[in-house]
């Protein structure tokens, strides 16, 4: 999983201008993020049509505010530069919940 460098929303949308992406918003201190993180390699393998990008909330706080990421862990799907879906809240997310979200896009 690629780790996103610090950038603003406009630069991010340029980066995501072609293809399908899942942005995984997380932070090292977040217990719910640590809960889902071990499942991410398997989720990535099962959804290989997407490129997964890890976004560290603390390194990209302005981007998170601009994108209205109000809780972590959160997932935002982009296709060809446009946001397609989001699973954004402050609740713990299970592997099944993330997979169900991605299956329903």
Predicted feature locations:
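N-terminal leader/targeting and pre-domain segments
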Residues: 1-21, 97-105
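Thiol-based oxidoreductase modules, predominantly thioredoxin-like and allied folds used
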Residues: 5-7, 25, 44, 48-62
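Short pre-active-site segment immediately N-terminal to redox-active cysteine/selenocysteine motifs
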Residues: 19, 26-29, 71
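Non-catalytic, surface beta->alpha helical segment in thiol-disulfide oxidoreductase systems
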Residues: 77-105
């Amino acid at each position: 999983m690629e780790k996103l460098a610090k950038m603003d929303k406009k630069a991010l949308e340029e980066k995501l201008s072609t293809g399908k992406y899942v942005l995984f918003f997380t932070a090292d201190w977040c217990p719910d993020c640590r809960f889902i993180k071990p499942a991410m390699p398997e989720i990535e393998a099962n959804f290989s049509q997407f490129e997964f990008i890890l976004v560290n909330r603390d390194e990209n706080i302005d981007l998170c505010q601009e994108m209205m990421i109000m809780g972590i862990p959160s997932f935002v799907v982009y296709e060809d530069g446009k946001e397609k879906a989001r699973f954004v809240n402050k609740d713990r997310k299970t592997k099944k919940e993330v997979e169900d979200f991605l299956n329903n896009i």
